[in-house]
Amino acid sequence: MQAPLQQLFDRGSLWLGNQPNHAADQASFVTTGQLELDQALGGGWQSQRLHEIQVPQFFVGELALVAPALMRATQQKRPIFWLSPPAVPYAPALAQLPLAESERQQAQHIVLTPSRPADALWAAETILHSGQAGVLLLWAEQPSAIAIRRLHLAAAESGAYVFILSPWQAEEARSYATRLRVHLSQDSVTGNGQVQWQLLKRTGGWPLRLARQALPKWPGK
């Protein structure tokens, strides 16, 4: 006999479309630095999952969303891998992260710039299978569904926070835990830049858009 629906909900075997799924271990989450986004994601970024951040152009505040994950990796003495970034990571900004001096000195940032997209995907998969990474950031223009599936499986074994940063992509089924699209606009009164988060996919909830807000700031500024 099937268990009553309520028992299935209580065990976390089922979820309601308008409610986040809290069955996951909260210790595996790290904040995005944005309260409403954390709530929509059930706690923030989850480790051992593949998260996509789609941007209309790079460096519009998206790195502020992953800064807390960089801090956690540093505190855990695990290296941070930057794969095919569009620019060299800005060392003075990384030095501003609110870490203890001993933690800051032991930070490991490894930048790899493969010449071909296929090599970058191979490097990402290899790094994740090694189990050494704390965070992996991969910039990819149009990764294939097969490549994403392979990275999804590798991320599940890695213990790392894994992010794919890309231009806007087609809204087709992909093996991501999170698909976040960044929309930019200006406040009609002040003229200041604003951002709106659109979650195309999230664990334990339907897609949604959050209210517009000011561009996120890098921690320590």
Language-model segments: what does each one mean?
Residues 1-82, 86, 93-106, 201-205, ...:
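Detector for small/aliphatic-rich hydrophobic stretches
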Residues 61, 119, 146:
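Residues that form or flank phosphate/diphosphate-binding pockets in enzymes
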Residues 65-69, 123, 147-151, 155:
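A short acidic, amphipathic alpha-helical/loop segment
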Residues 79-143:
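Long, charge-dense
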Residues 98-101, 128, 154, 174, ...:
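Short, hinge-like loop/turn segments at secondary-structure boundaries
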Residues 122-123, 147-150, 175-176, 209-211:
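A short secondary-structure junction signal
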Residues 128-173:
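A contiguous pocket-lining binding segment that forms or flanks enzyme active sites
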Residues 166-221:
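Phosphate-binding/switch region of NTP-binding enzymes
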